[in-house]
Swiss-Prot record:
CDD domains named among the record's database cross-references: AlaRS_core
GO MF annotations, alphabetized: alanine-tRNA ligase activity; aminoacyl-tRNA deacylase activity; ATP binding; tRNA binding; zinc ion binding
Organism annotation: Bacteroides thetaiotaomicron (strain ATCC 29148 / DSM 2079 / JCM 5827 / CCUG 10774 / NCTC 10582 / VPI-5482 / E50)
Predominant location: cytoplasm
Gene Ontology cellular component terms for the protein in this record: cytoplasm
Function of the molecule: Catalyzes the attachment of alanine to tRNA(Ala) in a two-step reaction: alanine is first activated by ATP to form Ala-AMP and then transferred to the acceptor end of tRNA(Ala). Also edits incorrectly charged Ser-tRNA(Ala) and Gly-tRNA(Ala) via its editing domain.
Annotated protein name in UniProt: Alanine--tRNA ligase
Length: 872
């Protein structure tokens, strides 16, 4: 039986023998494509070639690609663990042709590999072909069908509809028919009962798709019409885990050697056995799948967070923790302990797991601990909600309450449902779903972009000349209109550009496009599928005219200084803190720089000072830039250049050197370190577990900051009568202020006690109710303290109502004893209505509520209104 490693290697070896160049997996986290957060298919790293933005270096390519599918079109997350074949992170084996071979070779080689190399039984294989689409004017893919007929009987060739057998990159872009290969893994007796043909694409767990051959031959335009692609593309993808299942004779991906070591480790940790309990098995599969996703995301530079891709990873991690907590009794952090098992299983194929082991473990552990605390908070809130619901005589909590738990506190709906079932209660799912849809719609509206078709003026690709020039004559290749948030913008592609497109943490250049007719402002430059896009607010009236592309040199110079400073900072951090320092992110703007790096504790003030001294010493040394442009990657490594985890490098790279600082980098830099001027670190903080962040200024911004500091010191000296030692004067002031504050607090306590005693002596008893009312210029906190003290002493029939002035703002406070609440009075309802008299509003709990307002003259009337509403 072939192992997973042998299967992966056999695929690469087979296609290498067919003239394919084997490329490494791209990072799972995507950084230069605004339409995607994660690599969700093998073709993602080739999008710029498929879209025609760059020529293909190799016309035949194959690889094994790390993929992640959790959102959008490929949303498999909620199915993961519940069936035998869906995953979040998976490997995609694929082969591509860019303008070389097409359907015939793709089908022939797929058959040869599956049947002749892997020895799969051909009688168990089925192929689907596109049946055509009359409304699109597309006929059946008879060409693909004719090639399959060489290998398969006609009843094993199945027509598929547009949904299953016409692949599209998105709403616009390359597309075409596809042919899926399915395998029937059922035992013979099951195959005798019903044909596999009838189960293809019907979600049968043992009749599954293993390979999809996509024949890209069209381009979908913004108006929905299709046009032929200039160069046809073959894009195939085969699910590695499913292939392992088929070859190893298993009925579940999780029964293969891809997952079994992890499942056994989880079972041992939980004191159970895989295969004994359905719900526990689901939990173990969820964890076994999700630990891979989380670990690989962290190695590729994406940490869990509350935004965008980071939020997706946090969600996946929390889903795994929740299943462990609910079904496996894992009440403490546990997932980080599984990393050695993952490394044993996949470390050879993906050595980045080994290199990043310490960081991955720490991030996962801290995320687990934080979410376990959240779960405890959520359970307490749910307990209160259940109590309030039962007190109202109901057994169903509102969907809005459940959504608040989910959205604000990260408390999952299915866990809410589980706890409710245990207490004989339910949740209004329709209300919950309505709240969820409203939130999704708000997010869609915020992110919605309308993109027009590209208008092509001339063919060609973009040459970047920005390392050598800040002005360059250029012509527009193509442009399109986009609309976002009620703003119309234009994206312009030039044949040559000195504009640096945002990447590697450095923001894009701004500037102008100048022709003999007009000047167009470039407000940003982005990179989309490796293509520099110039963003403008208006389109040139004469787009075919040649123009000078002129970069804003002041902003460019400031960016260059900050970018070079990050390199010096990285080098200095390694020298001061240790060689474990690895860059985890950066942001370089004209105003400042931000640098994220792996480190497991706070950087001390003394260490920051040492780092600053080292960086500024190199700046004063005026070290010249040494640039190695377009050199082989192996040569770069021999130079000692530092590569970033999660970045994909080509075979030829650019290296930037300032003395001992040597890094792979495609950004803009100063000619010599002296141009930076000076570096001043302005903050150091934690970003995530094991990741610290430094923010700093350079050059003129340091000067501005020093001016501000000097102005502040001068002002303080003036305030302290030009004391010779400002530090001593401030400390003395703080000590004196603390003493005075203590005196005020003591006075307020005495006043509070005195007022309470007076109120007790002046209780009015009306219809058996002990009414305490007053109006005084007191802080809200003092009134609250008095109210709770009185409630502790008068346990029945207490009706407390007070008007107060807190910093000139009128406040109304009501406190009721429990028996009055039980009798139907609600403090919140009383203050809500009475607050109108002080032009305000408020609320609170049934026994205690407050309201604030604007009209101080209405306080006494508001007090009387409370009594009137209560019927007193």
């Amino acid at each position: 039986m072939l192992t997973a490693k042998e299967i992966r290697d056999s695929f690469k070896n087979f296609f290498e023998s067919k003239g394919h160049h084997i490329v490494p997996s791209a990072p799972m986290v995507i950084k230069d494509d605004p339409t995607l957060m994660f690599t969700n298919a093998g073709m993602n790293q080739f999008k710029d070639i498929i879209l025609g933005n760059h020529p293909a270096k190799y016309h035949r390519v194959a690889d094994s690609q790390k993929c992640l599918r959790v959102s959008g079109k490929h949303n498999d997350l909620e199915e993961v663990g519940h069936d035998t074949y869906h995953h979040t992170m998976f490997e995609m084996l694929g082969n591509w042709s860019f303008g070389d071979y097409f359907k015939k070779e793709a089908i022939n080689w797929a058959w040869e590999y599956l049947v002749e190399v892997l020895k799969l039984n051909p009688e168990h294989l089925y192929a689907t072909v596109f049946e055509g689409s009359p409304e699109e004017g597309l006929s059946r893919d008879d060409e693909a069908a004719s090639y399959w007929e060489q290998y398969l009987p006609k009843d094993h060739i199945i027509n598929g509809n547009k949904h299953d057998n016409f692949w599209e990159m998105g709403d616009t872009g390359p597309c075409g028919p596809c042919s899926e290969i399915h395998i029937d893994l059922r035992p013979a007796e099951e195959r005798a009962k019903i044909s596999g043909r009838d189960l293809v694409n019907h979600d049968h767990p043992q009749v599954i798709e293993i390979w999809n051959l996509v024949f890209m031959q069209y381009n979908r335009k913004a108006d929905g019409s299709l046009e032929p692609l200039p160069a046809k593309v073959i894009d195939t993808g085969m699910g590695f885990e499913r292939l392992c299942m088929a070859l190893q004779g298993k009925t579940s991906n999780y029964d293969t050697d891809v997952f079994q070591p992890m499942l056994k480790a989880i079972a041992a940790m939980s004191g159970t056995e895989y295969g004994k309990d359905k719900q526990q098995d689901i939990a173990m599969r969820v964890i076994a799948d999700h630990i891979r996703t989380i670990a690989f995301s962290i190695t590729d530079g994406q940490l869990p967070s509350n935004a965008k891709a980071g939020y997706v990873i946090r969600r996946i991690l929390r889903r795994a923790v929740r299943y462990g907590y609910t079904f496996l009794g894992q009440k403490q952090s546990f997932m980080y302990k599984l990393l050695p098992v993952l490394i044993d299983n996949m470390g050879d194929a993906y050595p980045e797991l080994i290199a990043q082991k310490g960081l991955i473990e720490k991030v996962i552990k801290e995320e687990e601990e934080a979410f376990l605390r959240t779960l405890e908070t959520g359970i307490r809130l749910l307990d209160k909600t259940m109590g309030d619901t039962k007190a109202a005589g109901k057994t169903e909590i509102s969907g809005k309450d459940a959504f608040t738990l989910y959205d604000t506190f990260g408390f999952p709906l299915d866990l809410t449902e589980l706890i409710l079932r245990e207490n004989g209660m339910t949740v209004n799912i329709e209300e919950f779903n309505a709240e969820m849809q409203q939130q999704k719609q708000r997010a869609r509206n915020a992110a919605a972009i309308e993109t027009g078709d590209w208008v092509t003026l001339r063919e060609g690709t973009t040459e970047f000349v920005g390392y050598d020039y800040t002005e360059y004559e250029a012509s527009i290749l193509r442009y399109r209109q986009i609309k976002q948030k009620n703003q119309t913008l234009y994206q312009i592609v030039l044949d040559c550009t000195p504009f640096y497109a945002e990447s590697g943490g450095q923001v894009g250049d701004t500037g102008v496009l100048v022709s003999e007719f007009e000047t167009i402002e470039v407000i940003d430059t982005k990179k989309e599928n490796n293509l520099p896009i110039h963003i403008t607010k208006k389109l040139p009236e004469h787009p075919e005219a040649p123009m000078m592309a002129c970069v804003d040199t002041d902003k460019r110079a400031a960016c260059a200084a900050n970018h070079s400073a990050t390199h010096l900072l990285d080098s200095a951090l390694r020298e001061v803190l240790g060689e474990h320092i690895e860059q985890k992110g950066s942001l370089v703007t004209p105003d400042s720089l931000r640098f994220d790096f792996s480190h497991f504790q706070k950087v001390t003030d003394e260490e920051i000072r040492q780092v600053e001294h080292l960086v500024n010493a190199k700046i004063r040394a005026n070290i010249p830039l040494k640039e190695y442009r377009n050199i082989p990657i192996e040569e770069a490594k021999e130079l000692g250049a530092i590569a970033l985890f999660g970045e994909k490098y080509g075979e030829r790279v650019r290296v930037i050197q300032f003395g001992s600082s040597i890094e792979f980098c495609g950004g803009i830099h100063v000619a010599a370190t002296g141009n930076i001027g000076m570096v001043k670190i302005i903050s150091e903080s934690s970003v995530a577990a094991g990741v610290r962040r430094i923010e700093a200024y350079t050059g003129a911004r340091v000067e501005e900051m020093l001016d501000t500091i000097q102005d502040t010191i001068s002002e303080l000296k003036s305030l302290f009568n030009n004391a010779p030692d400002l530090g001593i004067a401030i400390r003395k002031y703080i000590e004196e202020n603390a003493g005075l504050k203590k005196q005020v607090e003591d006075y307020m306590k005495e006043k509070e006690a005195s007022l309470k005693e007076r109120l007790l002596k002046n209780i009015q008893e009306i219809h058996g109710i002990k009414v305490i009312k007053f109006c005084a210029p007191l802080p809200a906190e003092v009134v609250k303290n008095i109210a709770f003290q009185l409630r502790g002493e008068i346990t029945e029939n207490l009706f407390f109502v007070a008007g107060s002035l807190d910093n000139g703002k009128p406040m109304l406070t009501v406190m009721l004893s429990d028996n009055l609440v039980a009798g139907g009075l609600k403090a919140g309802n009383l203050v809500k209505e009475a607050a109108k008299l002080i032009q305000g509003g408020g609320g609170g709990q049934p026994h205690f509520a407050t309201a604030g307002g604007k009209n101080t003259d209405g306080l006494n009337a508001a007090i009387e209104k409370v009594l009137e509403l209560a019927g007193i």
